[in-house]
């Protein structure tokens, strides 16, 4: 497989024990994974990028999940890791020149993970790659609460009222 025109294998490993329906924020999770996978792609010339999602524990009506993005990219030194989650900062100045980016992706991802009650962490070895990982707890959703529509025609000639309590 080629990702970004390079020989990179994408491996997706999802624990089959994870319930099909969970309540969480798919938009935030998508943003986190987009940022982490884009970074892994940016800093991996060849090798692999692995996305792992594992069920850690069932706590009543909640499920604790661990998420990780692991790459075989350039990795980072311990000094570079110290500044990794600072806004507008990349590992060093040459990174911005060579790979581009604003230095905000990881800061945003860290904030989103924290909003969901988790902590974004990283392990990295220079020249070998990096692993970004976090654990969050999501609520089990009732199967009844999630309708399965047979087709879009179900909504034909229907009116929809959308109410949002978000203040802007």
Model region roles, listed by residue range:
Residues 1, 74-75:
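Glycine-rich G1-box
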Residues 76-90:
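Short conserved segment of the HATPase_c
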Residues 40-41:
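Short helix-loop "hinge" at the ATP-lid/N-box region of the Bergerat-fold HATPase_c
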Residues 11-13, 56-63, 79, 133-164:
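Disordered, acidic interdomain junction associated with two-component signaling
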Residues 100, 105, 109:
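Short alpha-helical Gxxx[C/S/T] motif in the catalytic ATP-binding
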Residues 117-123:
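Glycine-rich ATP-binding loops of the HATPase_c
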Residues 4, 9-20, 56:
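Conserved catalytic submotifs in the C-terminal HATPase_c
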């Amino acid at each position: 497989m080629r990702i970004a025109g390079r020989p990179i294998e994408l491996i997706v490993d999802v624990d089959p024990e994870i319930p099909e329906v969970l309540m969480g924020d798919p938009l935030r999770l998508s943003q986190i994974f987009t940022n982490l996978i884009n970074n892994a792609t940016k800093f991996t010339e060849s090798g692999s990028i692995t996305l792992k999602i594992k069920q850690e524990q069932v706590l009543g009506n909640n499920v604790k999940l661990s998420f990780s993005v692991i790459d075989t990219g350039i990795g980072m030194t311990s000094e570079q890791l110290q500044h990794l989650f600072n806004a507008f900062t990349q590992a060093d100045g040459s990174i911005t020149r060579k790979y581009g980016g604003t230095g905000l992706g990881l800061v945003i991802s860290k904030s989103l993970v924290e909003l969901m009650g988790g902590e974004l962490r990283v392990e990295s070895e220079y020249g070998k790659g990096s692993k970004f990982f976090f654990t969050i707890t999501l609520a089990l959703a009732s199967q009844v609460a999630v309708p399965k529509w047979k087709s879009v025609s179900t909504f034909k000639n229907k009116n929809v009222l959308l109410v949002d309590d978000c203040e802007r």
